[in-house]
């Protein structure tokens, strides 16, 4: 005989005067009582255990279907005891997995529109687009970070003093010690300014047989952050000047004006 708990939670006496200990969990709690909430997996475990205990109290099932149901119940109980059931929603907070890049692209209307436009094009147009993207990627890797970006206006490295220090030491010593023909220096500054302001990506060429004039042109080019080189051409010296940047942005103070201030 199983005794039930009384209202105070203690053991209940039988009519014969005997005191029996209560067995909690034999009957489901009443709706008015305060019950500690348990997870879904624990409730499932409780009902499975209760079904197994009840099956031990009743005669063994003789039918094949009844026996199969009993074996299935015992098998489920074994799985829960050994491996443990998967946690339910009430067992803990389930953090949703972060969406992958493909899922994010599919949810973005702009990406979907670009993808649909690409897929609706012919095979030749698709190859042309892919080839362009590949060449653009390789060009960025060759240029490296920041190459082609002209920041001489806000970068303190391009102040007149730093521009002068960009000139080689030998040329700086010549400019400081010698009496520089300012008219020749200003003439080359005007030519380079007029040429590269119109065609920043072109190459300026000039035939110069005078070595001192070539020296002045090299100094002006280094001050303006231009690339200069000389080579023999049919018995004469040819100067080639090119711009290392995408745009031509000369210093605010030219070399001739900087030397006048020294």
UniProtKB/Swiss-Prot annotation:
The keyword Nucleus applies. Pfam families: R3H (PF01424), R3H-assoc (PF13902). The keyword Oxidoreductase does not apply. Residues 1-27, 132-155 are annotated as: Disordered. Residues 146-155 have a biased composition (Basic and acidic residues). Residues 182-245 form the R3H domain. GO terms for molecular function: nucleic acid binding. It is found in: Nucleus. One of its GO terms (cellular component) is nucleus. Its main location: nucleus. It comes from the Eukaryota. SUPFAM superfamilies: R3H domain (SSF82708). Keywords: Nucleus. This is R3H domain-containing protein 4. The lineage of its organism: Eukaryota, Metazoa, Chordata, Craniata, Vertebrata.
